[in-house]
């Protein structure tokens, strides 16, 4: 292993999903019931074929065992900024007569209350891949021990109800806690796959509940602007952050009648330049391009030079507006052109730009 230095930092460390944690803990609890083995580590097989040892913080009978067994592990998200990192994910398993697996939401795991997700209303928020992982591991364990019955599996997350408030679950209609997630079993640092998945879920839930006008917003200020402008409810507001591309591309699979995209002027200027990831590490504000666009609308040489020399995009648009050059509208028109290249023609797209006070300073339809 090489030594980490400022010039050569160590690679970012991957972690494991809550689905992997649930699989390991349910397997350990079931093994205790069927084989009497108290496990310190549970080895699981991930969907892509990797065998992973998951350390446990407890594995014990509940009562004298008549009520089942439980096991827990500490969620390790690696170097990903995951809200569940360090939380204890646990499973309580009870043997039942009917073959198969019954899933329950324990403390800290949410319940689906709105249509549009991959799970029916009323089901615990344990996603399909984690369900399949648990079912396969438990079926293999049952076969090893010639057990013909089934399992009732309750998954919980300590502190999950509070952690869920930091996620999109309440807006998606997943109430009471977190979702048990994962498609590969592995968390890739800063992959943002979970965030993008939640954007898609937000769109799907809104459509399933009859909303035909959605507003995709970069943050709280743009959400407030869309609430004030259109009176849209929270379910129709899609918190996209920097991932405007995730919204626009999803329209191909899940179109709506009307899509309003709203963000800060700087973010919208990046979209106008063709960037679909608006984060500063992946795209930057092109002041030269803003000056050129202003020139096309009558900006003189002095204003163009001022825009090129501006410290921020907000300063650039303020300079332009002070001389009656509608740079906010110009940027929105270019952003709209980019969006229309992606979304299907039946989606009526519009753009809104706001300033730092949350006031609308540009629009295009």
UniProtKB/Swiss-Prot annotation:
Its EC number is 2.1.1.195. It is an enzyme of class 2 (transferase). InterPro entries: CbiD (IPR002748), CbiD_sf (IPR036074). It holds the Pfam family CbiD. Gene3D superfamilies: CbiD-like (3.30.2110.10). Disulfide bonds: none annotated. Coiled coil: none annotated. It comes from the Bacteria. GO terms for biological process: anaerobic cobalamin biosynthetic process; methylation. Keywords: Cobalamin biosynthesis, Methyltransferase, S-adenosyl-L-methionine, Transferase. One of its GO terms (molecular function) is cobalt-precorrin-5B C1-methyltransferase activity. It catalyses: Co-precorrin-5B + S-adenosyl-L-methionine = Co-precorrin-6A + S-adenosyl-L-homocysteine. Pathway: Cofactor biosynthesis; adenosylcobalamin biosynthesis; cob(II)yrinate a,c-diamide from sirohydrochlorin (anaerobic route): step 6/10. Belongs to the CbiD family. This is Cobalt-precorrin-5B C(1)-methyltransferase. It comes from Paraburkholderia phytofirmans (strain DSM 17436 / LMG 22146 / PsJN). The gene is cbiD.
